[in-house]
Amino acid sequence: MATATVATTPEGIPVIILKEGSSRTYGKEALRANIAAVKAIEEALKSTYGPRGMDKMLVDSLGDITITNDGATILDKMDLQHPTGKLLVQIAKGQDEETADGTKTAVILAGELAKKAEDLLYKEIHPTIIVSGYKKAEEIALKTIQEIAQPVTINDTDVLRKVALTSLGSKAVAGAREYLADLVVKAVAQVAELRGDKWYVDLDNVQIVKKHGGSVNDTQLVYGIVVDKEVVHPGMPKRIENAKIALLDASLEVEKPELDAEIRINDPTQMHKFLEEEENILKEKVDKIAATGANVVICQKGIDEVAQHYLAKKGILAVRRAKKSDLEKLARATGGRVISNIDELTSQDLGYAALVEERKVGEDKMVFVEGAKNPKSVSILIRGGLERVVDETERALRDALGTVADVIRDGRAVAGGGAVEIEIAKRLRKYAPQVGGKEQLAIEAYANAIEGLIMILAENAGLDPIDKLMQLRSLHENETNKWYGLNLFTGNPEDMWKLGVIEPALVKMNAVKAATEAVTLVLRIDDIVAAGKKSGSEPSGKKEKDKEEKSSED
């Protein structure tokens, strides 16, 4: 590592610039160190890429094991120290939050671009020229995706299902992907809203509940909400049809006074009257609820035992300590309103569901709220024989939900299997000579990096990458073969659109943007100044966590 903490004047007098323990890496060494970090992260993810990719076993400091091939999860659980590595993880997380998929594509493409940039640096091409060439290549890549993308609407159920199948195909749950893809498409279509002429999908309205037990094929879609609580009183009904639901953000308990108060009781009759008055207060609250016609109460706060007794006597099913998010979803699903004051509750505030029922799921009891007229919130109850299978199924479903939502929102899809990448590379090679100069080399390097994704797909499937790449290049010379990609199960080039390997155009575009942004950012850095670590100080991670906690309290 090149270090320079001391400089000298023309007279040779030393001048201390940085504190003792600090280090500085600059020039080509800084560039190479940053590129090496990007390449190292790519190497960690490369073997998981594509439907024939492998899984990673991640063990944390407590010994907890995660088995996954989800790019965002792997990066999240990697304890990275290098600042450039952390930067790449942030970009990958941004990709995951924006489009729910394509994190591996973004990181691996960034790694390939970094490798090609390193080759150009060895040829004495300045980083600024490489960045300029990469930016021009990015524009062509995005333009290509926009031009070849196929329009898709929310009514194209078959295409949406294929998008879900493609996303699930690379996950550990691929054996149940046909069944899960149907659930995903139905769930997203149910919560989608038309605003003006654009479709909007808020995936927060798809509740995911996990319960260990059964198999992945026991996973079910509920047109309503699953509340992970049981009915509060054994005397209450466990099943209510044509349910009228009161959603309460208020407790069914005798509230304590805000100010400290003392009550002096001189004889037992006063104590009896005191308890009787408490009971009357609770009875009045229950009577007010019953008067609205409610036969189900779902409460965010507590329900006193006396109130439970009176609710049971009136045949009302009640649930307490429900999560705030569950109440909000129930309001959307049933058309009800969350009420903070029981005195203000009216029949107009009640939600409706065809059925509210307590069911045993595994070893636990849960309350299912189903059959709302037009539920804008739905639930997916995930089952699986192992907890790790359940967790991986959740990750797979979240990615699939995100990709289907992306297609509905954006209205465009492209074929997978490397078809888009080879088409981009072809157009970049035609464009590069028009630019000329050293930038031409950078654009051609970008084309080679894009093709690197196809070679990794082929390698992970046990195929000869160069042989398959040449076959695809030859096929794409014919304009009618734009959707030809690599069928990784047969090893032959095929029309990926006809084969049903379809991906959101938005995911591809965001991956190209994220990868190019990451590499151009790295190429612009020519100096790394690292402060020395203070002895006996807290780990930086703990300090950051404490800062976050303090800011959240404020």
Swiss-Prot record:
InterPro entries: Chaperone_TCP-1, Chaperonin_TCP-1_CS, Cpn60/GroEL/TCP-1, GroEL-like_apical_dom_sf, GROEL-like_equatorial_sf, TCP-1-like_intermed_sf, TCP-1_chaperonin, thermosome_alpha
Bilayer-spanning residue ranges: none
Bias kind Basic and acidic residues: ranges: 540-554
Superkingdom of origin: Archaea
One Pfam family this sequence matches: Cpn60_TCP1
Family under the similarity heading: Belongs to the TCP-1 chaperonin family.
Subunit annotation: Forms a Heterooligomeric complex of two stacked eight-membered rings.
Name of protein: Thermosome subunit beta
Gene expressing this chain: thsB
